[in-house]
UniProtKB/Swiss-Prot annotation:
CDD domains: RHOD_YceA. It is an enzyme of class 1 (oxidoreductase). Belongs to the TrhO family. GO terms for molecular function: oxidoreductase activity, acting on paired donors, with incorporation or reduction of molecular oxygen. The gene is trhO. The lineage of its organism: Bacteria, Pseudomonadati, Pseudomonadota, Gammaproteobacteria, Enterobacterales. Gene3D superfamilies: 3.30.70.100, Rhodanese-like domain. This is tRNA uridine(34) hydroxylase. Its EC number is 1.14.-.-. It comes from Escherichia coli O9:H4 (strain HS).
Amino acid sequence: MPVLHNRISNDALKAKMLAESEPRTTISFYKYFHIADPKATRDALYQLFTALNVFGRVYLAHEGINAQISVPASNVETFRAQLYAFDSALDGLRLNIALDDDGKSFWVLRMKVRDRIVADGIDDPHFDASNVGEYLQAAEVNAMLDDPDALFIDMRNHYEYEVGHFENALEIPADTFREQLPKAVEMMQAHKDKKIVMYCTGGIRCEKASAWMKHNGFNKVWHIEGGIIEYARKAREQGLPVRFIGKNFVFDERMGERISDEIIAHCHQCGAPCDSHTNCKNDGCHLLFIQCPVCAEKYKGCCSEICCEESALPPEEQRRRRAGRENGNKIFNKSRGRLNTTLGIPDPTE
């Protein structure tokens, strides 16, 4: 029986990936469709992906599939053909190709079965996730941005919005998608006569969010097909102005794709213009935050003097201090002045 999970250490896999000479292509895709047996589907896809040397993160549930992956350039077309042939629901599926890609986004394949491909917190039995808003293409997005009756709603988390967003887009302040959905309905109650345009990184969150808004009585709802990634690609291909400003946060080692030259965020330590996310180098912290090169040198990649001092301690002493401590996978929320301690290199399903 084939091994259907990874048995090699992360460090060894990362070193192997970095030593590769063949270029890779970072791809994301999703599809809402019924999967009768997610576990069997997961095992079959794992074998298919492994045979093509695909790395990345894939989630499956009864409601569909959500994937962010890295594929050897020479295998991209074979991967596309085999994915399309795997299930009729996947035939012709749009694959979002990364905009700013060094091919080093992933080094291991992780494929998991979950209750939902996006953690939405919805338990309303009458909710119809297929009753989505209308798609918008790049030219239509730009037209909507100039429409005074249109409101753009960013359905990403606060740390994503902080480094980049559409002009005048509204932020729904939250740490997770499940928190955003009820807040979006609440914040838009006074604007039911407006055109609501929802967007996210690759389309998966705003598609479900558009259905949720319609379920809650909003009739004029649109969402951007393929999200920010597909919008920027099509706008560039068609010679249209790209109206997204800043960087598009992505959920892999790159942590961002440059969309425009503007830097709209600031270093969380000194306030200098900066939009580069990093994780605190202290193994007892790993806070996700924005740090400029000057502060990176000053604090040796750490988020504070305390973490800088702790990371310089002998490994055994660091382990002793970490024992029993709630640590790791924190995200700095500057707007709220607090940390969310439940997220990692953030999980795209949250």
